[in-house]
Amino acid sequence: IRKQPHVGVAFFFDGACEEGVVHESMNLASSMKLPMLFVVENNLFSSHLDIHLRQPGNRVARFAEAHAIATEVVDGNDVLAVADAAARLVARARRGDGPGFIEAVTYRWLGHVGADANIDVGVRRSVREVALWKKRDPIARLEVALSTERGIEPAQFGNIRGRVENIVE
């Protein structure tokens, strides 16, 4: 609208895709070719229910596709894959080609409320399932990628972690 290089970004979870306001927002963004990036963290649970109990499929990118929005489905536990997808879709939005949508597929390690590893209303996940996802820890995977692909020495990660913790506090 203002013809500036800015791109609006909205982060939300898979359960929000079941709300009308999300579809209204995507429809408006697509119709007006707004420079917008929708980022959905699909952790496979909405509040207390597995996605398979709420939807006919486990991917939510189909909702954006219905609004003619460019979509990318990525491994949400791969920080670099998410960053690469965001860079592509932001560049597209800045060119005036309309909004983009990232579905970052990940997993919620803990319950919706509190620190219980199980879902809060009696749904129990197997220990094996949770353990498999924990092996895909995005921070540990990023450290491996940065050391093998970007040449960052493993000894530097302690300093990086400390700086990040200071920023977060």
Predicted regions and their residues:
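Glycine-rich ThDP/TPP pyrophosphate-binding loop and its adjacent helix/strand module
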Residues: 1-168
